[in-house]
Amino acid sequence: MSVPAIAVYTSPPGAVYTSSSSSELEASSRGSAPCATAAPPSPASSHRHQAIAGGLSCLFSSPTAAPRAAAAQDELGALWHDRSGEATAVGGGGGGGGYSYPQPSSPFKWRDMLHHSPVPLFHSPASSPASRSPSASWLAGRERERLFSSFVRNALGSCVDYAPVAALPLGVSAAVGVGAGELAFELDEHLSEAEPSCEPYARDLLAGAQARHRIFHDELVVKAFFEAERAHRGQTRASGDPYLQHCVETAVLLAKIGANATVVSAGLLHDTIDDSFMDYDQIFRMFGAGVADLVEGVSKLSHLSKLARDNNTASRTVEADRLHTMFLAMADARAVLIKLADRLHNMKTIEALPLVKQQRFAKETMEIFVPLANRLGIASWKDQLENICFKHLNPEEHKELSSKLVISFDEALLTSTLDKLDKGLRDEGISYHSLSGRHKSLYSIYSKMIKKNLTMDDVHDIHGLRLVVDTEQDCYQALDIVHKLWPRVAGRFKDYILHPKLNGYRSLHTVIMCEGIHPFEVQIRTKEMHLQAEYGFAAHWRYKEGGCKHSFVLQMVEWARWVLTWQCEAMSKERSSGLGRSDAIRPPCPFPSHSEDCPYSYTRQCNHDGPIFVIMLEHDKMSVQELPANSTVVDLMERVGANSPRCSPYSFPLKEELRPRVNHKPISDPNRKLCMGDVVELTPALPHKSLTEYREEIQRMYERGGFALATTRDGPAS
């Protein structure tokens, strides 16, 4: 049975609450031990120690303590941690898997509540004589449960009322006046340390992640790590690795693109709803709505992904296009990023799966997740996903092209080209952030060769240089220098600064001839453009919002508008031009900007004429249905009935036989409006009889021979 621990600090409140800055208070709220390491009180505050009341102490304090309790409530809320479910792990070292923040010396101590009234405890000074030790059986048994269930159950925390402390001389620590180890009770020795219970390999994983990125030292992320370890304990992947390792690698990918603690924590927990005992409510209680909503969003995307894979939706171009558009429109884009990170690590370890599954996952990734990464603008993830899929879908071509790429690479030529450009920039007084060599991704080369019917020698941008400068003006000045140093290939200059790509990519591209025979592509961009190119929608995480053209919230709104706008315009152009693919159709406004008078502008708060897409499950088969705006369940049912040649034995249309469920829940109002991304299940409805009566009737028909007659009359079952 889960029992929350009651905890108190071993130092007087002055050592904890008299901090002179908000940063010190924040440090205290993150779980640092306030006892021996507390700074000496300032002269202004050392003589004003007051009793701090809160939590359960409000039940027992004098009337004068009530105002103090209310005033201290906000401060105390950050200092007390919910430790429900920990008693087994802390008390007996069992496999309960409880969590607490890892600390060198925990400030939490256990009270002897069984043998002493809480009233004198809450009012006694910190230096009062120690009371008798708890019995060995105190932490187990019905007495403990009865005690806690009577008045402590679900308590958020508790505190001690301290008696005023006399002023201390300047420079003398409060710990001198009050014994740091003296409590109103003695401490069970084995309870003094409240360390998380987890496997040794898990601690190694956490240490490794912390060495790779500092965000894994964050309190929220550490808490998410231990909860993920508890949720996935004992689970392994097909490769034999612990499941927790996949969670950590997913979170590391997110950390590398600059994700904050909320997103990284959700990355650690992204599979808990689908693959463990945890549900949304538990995550919400432990981490709040921010993390819980993201984990739930990833779970929904995973569900749709599985449906698409099982029904081979990726092979149907129209439905695949609708599906990944729906992914972007229906979910927080951060949930899509987490799902992409999850898929990227899965693809990196795909060798552990059987060959058939490798092919299926690679095909789905290429058709669904690569376009997602492209539209979000995360070039590095897109390239990695494409190359892995290319290796498994076209192994022979991949091997041949890899060999040719290695042969064509000339390191000496690249080095001399870099040196020449560096000297030219310095001579003209152009500073830059970075200058490096690059090469086109393997799949991009292959795709270009197939699309334009070229040989590898005809692809001019396989190798190149990338220059990152300070300002947009520097981009064009550097371009002039490049064209003075080398002859350029006619028709190969592209100005993506004036004409950005659909996903927001901006840069200058030109192709030059080195030593007269070797084509090199040169990319020139600013630092902000480089972040946008590498991290796309996540680029705002890489620099302060104050330096952005669009704030984070505005970008989220514009993202949702752009996705729906793009789809509305693309489908309109598709109908008029007969194009089979809509990727090449340009939206009316470039992302993330949007003109106010655009006829296709969309927000979730206003009416719009754009279509919605819903997942329809009928007889375990999935399809992605396009419906007009404001469509209802009845509209979908009528479409199903109209498109089906079958009728029921009672001559009702097929839709009358079906009982719809929306997002796995029965609906009472068939006129309910459908939303983007809804999952509608159409299941046959049994007659209004009990199942027993239904079986008995079938048995009687069989015994009378009527079953054969009915079968002959109605024809064989389809």
Swiss-Prot record:
Residue stretches of biased makeup (Low complexity): 19-39
Keywords: ATP-binding, Chloroplast, GTP-binding, Kinase, Nucleotide-binding, Plastid, Stress response, Transferase, Transit peptide
Catalytic activity annotation: GTP + ATP = guanosine 3'-diphosphate 5'-triphosphate + AMP
Location(s) in or outside the cell: Plastid, Chloroplast
Uppermost EC category: transferase
EC number of this enzyme: 2.7.6.5
Annotated transit peptide: 1-68
Cross-referenced SUPFAM superfamilies: HD-domain/PDEase-like, Nucleotidyltransferase
Location of the HD domain: 243-347
Record-level GO cellular component terms: chloroplast
CDD domains linked: HDc, NT_Rel-Spo_like
UniProt cross-references to PROSITE patterns, sorted A to Z: HD
GO biological process: guanosine tetraphosphate metabolic process
Family to which this protein belongs: Belongs to the RelA/SpoT family.
Protein name: Probable GTP diphosphokinase RSH2, chloroplastic
